[in-house]
């Protein structure tokens, strides 16, 4: 007669094989990330590394696109099923007649930092000093461009009095600072920590935490998120729920583990030869993440306020914020991450 231990062992193997089989037969889901190595989008790759997609029986491919605007275009073209990018794209797209909704909110704040070049720091001590300056953004029409304009406006400087230059992110942003092509610019970790370490730039506005974001924007600003076309979610409710559960488990993992633990899960090419710098950047960024993937109550209104000020597509339009996100898929109980 079999012992309980033998039965449990056989059952465990059977379950593992069943999960592997389910993933093998699952329809591939492709997710485009607006810059996969950015820490604001950390949950995308971390979910894959932790095996949470496979645990849900999903076959997910993560692709990277430097700018969120381009990732959005891939989604609308049907080339990818989901995007990890800024929540504000869902509002912008609704103004253009496209129904896209965020299923999981990663960041309750932008995680963005306005950095000022050390060369320009003496004459640029706040956003009130950007008149006549060149400000770097990832791309024109990007989330960073709207945030930059809003910060300047709050400081009393209209968008006609400075220049925005699209310089991308990561190494291209660093090059723009070093070459003196921009006086200041908006970027994220780990680029922020790299510039601080080399002494090429200083922090001007810090939106990596709730306090700094409320001071800069007047409220929380949900940013990094996982969004899909509304029609896709309704036609693939099971997959949408499983994806949301996988991401929610990752957010729980982030909330319950140290920066060192998280960094240990990431591929080496995410931190290169400077793991300590990456861990430091992670520590500075951890407060930005939600613990459960749900939309902060005051978030959508703040985002709409920013977009209504500078996005010509949104300005003057009626936006139904309730259609830009849903907590339905992450509301179901999710097992606590223990890996």
Ranges and model annotations:
Residues 22-26:
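Boundary at the C-terminal end of the N-terminal hydrophobic targeting segment
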Residues 16-21:
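N-terminal signal peptide c-region/cleavage motif recognized by signal peptidases
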Residues 233-314:
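Secondary-structure end/capping motifs
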Residues 1-11:
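Bacterial N-terminal signal peptides that target proteins for export
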Residues 304-339:
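Conserved C-terminal helix/tail region of periplasmic/extracytoplasmic solute-binding proteins
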Residues 172-267:
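Pocket-lining segment of extracytoplasmic ligand-binding domains
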Residues 28-167, 176-189, 200, 204-205:
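Short, glycine-/small- and polar/acidic-enriched structural segments
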Residues 126, 209-219, 286-296:
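Short, solvent-exposed loop/beta-turn-alpha elements that line the ligand-binding surface or hinge
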């Amino acid at each position: 007669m079999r012992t309980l231990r033998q039965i449990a062992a056989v059952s465990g193997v059977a379950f593992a094989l069943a999960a592997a089989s389910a993933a093998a037969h699952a329809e591939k889901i492709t997710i485009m990330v607006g810059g996969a190595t950015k820490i604001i989008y950390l949950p995308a790759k971390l979910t894959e590394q932790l095996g949470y997609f496979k645990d849900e029986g999903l076959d997910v491919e993560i692709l990277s696109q430097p700018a969120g605007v381009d990732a959005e275009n891939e989604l609308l073209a049907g080339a990818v099923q989901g995007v990890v990018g800024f929540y504000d794209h869902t509002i912008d797209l609704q103004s253009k007649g496209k129904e896209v909704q965020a299923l999981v909110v990663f960041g309750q704040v932008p995680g963005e930092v306005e950095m000022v070049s050390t060369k320009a720091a003496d004459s640029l001590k706040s956003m009130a000093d950007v008149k006549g300056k060149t400000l770097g953004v990832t791309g024109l029409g990007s989330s960073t461009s709207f945030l930059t304009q809003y910060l300047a406006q709050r400081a009393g400087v209209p968008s006609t009095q400075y220049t925005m230059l699209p310089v991308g992110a990561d190494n291209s942003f660093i090059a723009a600072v070093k070459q003196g092509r921009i006086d200041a610019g908006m970027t994220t970790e780990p680029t922020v920590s790299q510039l601080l370490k080399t002494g090429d730039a200083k922090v001007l506005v810090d939106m990596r935490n709730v306090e700094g974001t409320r001071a800069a924007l007047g409220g929380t600003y949900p940013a990094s998120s996982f969004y899909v076309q509304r029609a896709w979610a309704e036609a693939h409710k099971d997959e949408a729920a499983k994806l949301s559960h996988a991401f929610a488990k990752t957010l729980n993992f982030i909330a319950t583990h140290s920066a060192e633990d998280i960094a240990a899960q990431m591929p080496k090419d995410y931190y290169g030869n400077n793991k300590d710098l990456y861990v430091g950047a992670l520590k500075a960024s951890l407060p930005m993440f939600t613990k459960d993937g749900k939309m902060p109550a005051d978030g959508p209104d703040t985002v709409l306020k920013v977009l209504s000020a500078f996005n010509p597509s949104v300005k003057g339009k009626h936006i139904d914020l309730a259609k830009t996100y849903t907590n339905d898929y992450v509301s179901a109980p999710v097992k606590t991450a223990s890996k």
